[in-house]
UniProtKB/Swiss-Prot annotation:
Listed name of the protein: Large ribosomal subunit protein bL27
GO molecular function: structural constituent of ribosome
Listed InterPro entries: Ribosomal_bL27, Ribosomal_bL27_CS
Record keywords: Ribonucleoprotein, Ribosomal protein
GO biological process entries: translation
Domain of life: Bacteria
Organism phylogeny: Bacteria, Pseudomonadati, Campylobacterota, Epsilonproteobacteria, Campylobacterales
PROSITE patterns: RIBOSOMAL_L27
Signal peptide (from-to): none
Primary gene name: rpmA
Annotated Gene Ontology cellular component terms: cytosolic large ribosomal subunit
Keyword flag Kinase: no
Length: 85
């Protein structure tokens, strides 16, 4: 008889749940003020015109308009919202 209980094979078989990060509204989509455009960790995408940035780096629309993804540097990208004209 074993004097210790056998270790199960599931001891290391855990995984954390997904954080639901990523782009929520894509380029060309219409957004209303307050709509979340991107959820991200850090500023992988920077805030451009008519968008705000939350304390958790979430980018959201400040006005009603159309989402546009742009480059403002060789390596950096930003997202802006432009009103329908």
């Amino acid at each position: 008889m074993a004097h210790k209980k056998g270790q199960g094979s599931t001891q290391n078989n855990r995984d954390s749940i997904g954080r639901r990060l990523g782009v929520k509204k894509f380029g060309g989509e219409f957004v209303r003020a307050g709509n979340i455009i991107i959820r991200q960790r850090g500023t992988a995408t920077h805030a451009g015109n008519n968008v705000g940035i939350g304390t958790d780096h979430t980018i959201f629309a400040l006005i009603d308009g159309v989402v546009k993804f742009e480059r403002f540097d060789k390596t950096r990208k930003q997202v802006s919202v432009y009103p329908l004209s």
